[in-house]
Amino acid sequence: MSAATTSAAGRLTDGELKAREKAARKAEKARQKRIAADEAAERRRSAKAGFANVNNPRRSTLLTVLCAVFAVYCLFPFVYLLINATKTQADFTSTFGLGFGKTFALFDNIATVFSYQDGIFGRWLLNTLLYVVVGAGGATLLAIMGGYALAKFRFPGRNAVFAVIIGAISVPGIALAVPQFLLFAKLGLTNTPWAMIIPSLISPFGLYLMWIFSEQAVPQELLEAARVDGASEFRTFWQISLPLLAPGIVTTALFTIVATWNNYFLPLIMLKDADWYPLTIGLNQWKDQASTAGGQAIQNLVITGSLITIIPLVIAFLCLQKYWQSGLAAGAVKE
């Protein structure tokens, strides 16, 4: 390519990149259509097998009943929390678990939760948000960059990295908690926020998910065209690849957020100061206090605090379900 041609390509970079972005969005829409077509084909295959066949109502009814039972099983804890969070402590101990009390005390319970023990619940909530924003956010960012690099670049040792990631996924996190505690104790980082944040930054499953999604969602032709037009790797990633990776990013973020938000064993062994507890450990402390002989009866506060704890996750999944469902399906669809 001559210098004049290269210069012209450089001058047209912005326009060309906009065209590439438009093509990328068009490719993403086409990919979504292919996913929908494959899902429709799968439903037709299931119908022929009898699972959703109107001519075979027995199997269809059985499947519906099984799904309904599973849905009730999943929703029962949430319904139990919702009902009992409306009770006073007296009603909680004197009424049936799935029956409402004489007094609707939900808002009083919420106010008491945030004022009990000098408002320690609010501190636990802020701690949890800190661990999620920094830990889960950092894990998502590293998974995006690492997964994209592994999917789109070829380098020596790539297969070995893949084997390490698969091996890391197969190791339960609880098996690493004690070695992590010993390491952090030697470094003097126990009972500090870093004891929660640093282990949360590594998500083998998130890295694997972004790797697979990057392979499926970002056509290599778009990257090659952007490079020919003079775009840097960073600009190619930021303006072309990143919009296509949005469903995978949301899916990875949700997995890491839920894992960090619900983390129990790691803070249990890492943290001693209640001022650094996340919600999981703090609520468990209240539960132990309520169930100990001679302890203060605060079961209604434990129930209300648990309800407050799960509401953000429920809202996040409901608002982002379009993205994470697409992200999970992408790795299973052959382009």
Predicted regions and their residues:
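Transmembrane alpha-helical segments of polytopic membrane transport and secretion proteins
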Residues: 1-67, 294-295, 321-335
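A structural signal for multi-pass alpha-helical bundles of membrane permease subunits
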Residues: 60-335
